[in-house]
Amino acid sequence: MNVEVWFHGTLEECATGKRIVEMADGASLGELIDWLSKEYGAELKREIERAEENYIMLNGNYCKLTSERYKPLQDGDIVAFIPILTGG
């Protein structure tokens, strides 16, 4: 199956802005993150897993990595990783 992955903000420094990833049918959100870590490095995984500081969107809906890591993905899903902006 193919999953469309978008990286926004500072995560674009670790990976490309947009990419189609081919995964095994039924692969989970966590497996996608593990694959991305192997492709782009551990730095990206650390950034993504800072769940309290980042948004993960699946088809436009917010996902909590702590509770939805094993959620199976579907062909054509769109997963976006969006860091929350901070500053003052």
List each model region and its residues.
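Ubiquitin-like/PB1-type beta-grasp interaction modules and other compact soluble beta-rich domains
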Residues: 1-87
